């Protein structure tokens, strides 16, 4: 049995520890960059082009806020960065994004709106009786008048002459479609995107993106040895090798045991076969995630807007209840879908994958 223990240790190191340890190292910015790789309570990841690129002015303040500096529009808080889609969600530090939009100018920055939508901003006297479903913009309203905004031209015209048009401007929007009523989203977040440098391919393959050299504006993907992260294909191969190694180890141990106990040969093989047959059920029973792994998934406390960043709606897909202010939601890392933290925690303990797209972390 001494030989069996040595074989077990060898296979364990070869097929489990070495591959998985190598595959789990995170990618980093260059060593010359002193900024942290994550910043703020939302732990916004900071990597190229937001480090090492002169046009992407991203800072982590002393108050632990992730701040984006736009040349013509000032500073904004960063809520979320999608490196694969090359999109960034920002908001106003004073929680009055609608006011910033009245003078918003994206010139001189590498960003552009995903869609440009023409909005009409109006002011109406408070004496004017309006339906309760006409949401005003509180931070722009006062004791005598209320401020409204809509991308529906006909709706804006119907408010005249009781209300006055303050301004008509193009506003960066998530969708090209006009709203049918007054907007309640202008104070939530602003979606911008960048097309250059193009690092989408690197991000999809979990490779590090960066300049080819200090003198060239061109970028390239750096391999696993430099970035410390392997592509999906390599990770899949390593996992397959680990499984094969486990099977070989198991069969080897059974063979050695049978060889050392000849009197029990007639029933040892069927017992081993029965054990092998039971393995898939055991694997299926343990497909859920443990609590420590679930706790590593990003959470966020919703604000007054009740709308999480990204393409998520305001309804939890699991319990079908609308989110409310101050509720905590949790995000699935691979697809950024979010749910009530208490709902998704129960789900992940059983299934271990996103209930919407079934993606799971390798």
From Swiss-Prot:
It is a single-pass membrane protein. Pathway: Protein modification; protein ubiquitination. Residues 1-23 form the signal peptide. The chain crosses the membrane at residues 234-254. Keywords: Membrane, Metal-binding, Signal, Transferase, Transmembrane, Transmembrane helix, Ubl conjugation pathway, Zinc, Zinc-finger. Its EC number is 2.3.2.27. It is an enzyme of class 2 (transferase). The RING-type zinc finger domain mediates binding to an E2 ubiquitin-conjugating enzyme. This is Putative RING-H2 finger protein ATL21B. The gene is ATL21B.
């Amino acid at each position: 049995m001494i030989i069996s223990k040595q074989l077990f240790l060898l296979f364990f190191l070869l097929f489990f520890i070495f591959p998985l340890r190598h595959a789990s190292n995170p990618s980093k910015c260059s060593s010359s960059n002193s900024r942290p790789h994550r910043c703020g309570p939302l732990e916004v990841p900071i990597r190229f082009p937001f480090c090492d690129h002169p046009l992407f002015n991203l800072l982590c303040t002393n108050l632990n806020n992730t701040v984006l500096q736009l040349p013509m529009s000032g500073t904004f808080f960063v809520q979320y960065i999608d490196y694969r889609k090359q999109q960034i969600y920002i908001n106003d530090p004073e929680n009055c994004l609608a006011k910033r939009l009245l003078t918003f100018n994206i010139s001189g920055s590498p960003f552009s709106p995903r869609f440009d939508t023409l909005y009409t901003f109006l002011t109406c006297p408070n004496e004017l009786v309006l339906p309760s479903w006409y949401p005003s913009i509180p931070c722009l309203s006062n004791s005598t008048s209320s401020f409204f905004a809509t991308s529906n031209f006909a709706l804006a015209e119907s408010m005249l002459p009781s209300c006055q048009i303050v301004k008509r401007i193009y506003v960066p929007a998530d969708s090209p479609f006009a709203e049918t009523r007054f907007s309640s989203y202008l104070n939530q977040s602003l979606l911008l995107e960048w097309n250059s440098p193009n690092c989408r391919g690197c991000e999809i393959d979990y490779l590090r993106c960066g300049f080819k050299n200090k003198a060239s504006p061109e970028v390239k993907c750096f391999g696993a040895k430099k970035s410390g992260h392997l592509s999906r294909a390599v990770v899949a191969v390593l996992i397959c090798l680990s499984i094969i190694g486990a099977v070989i180890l198991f069969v080897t141990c059974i063979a050695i045991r049978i060889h050392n106990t000849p009197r029990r040969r007639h029933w040892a093989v069927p017992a081993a076969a029965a054990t092998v047959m039971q393995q898939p059920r055991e694997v299926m029973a343990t497909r859920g995630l443990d609590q420590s792994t679930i706790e590593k998934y990003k959470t966020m406390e919703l604000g007054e807007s009740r709308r999480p960043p990204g393409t998520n709606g305001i309804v939890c897909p699991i319990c079908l209840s609308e989110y409310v202010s101050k509720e905590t939601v949790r995000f699935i890392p691979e697809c950024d879908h979010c749910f009530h933290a208490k709902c998704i925690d129960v789900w992940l303990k059983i299934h271990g994958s996103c209930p919407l797209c079934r993606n799971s972390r390798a």
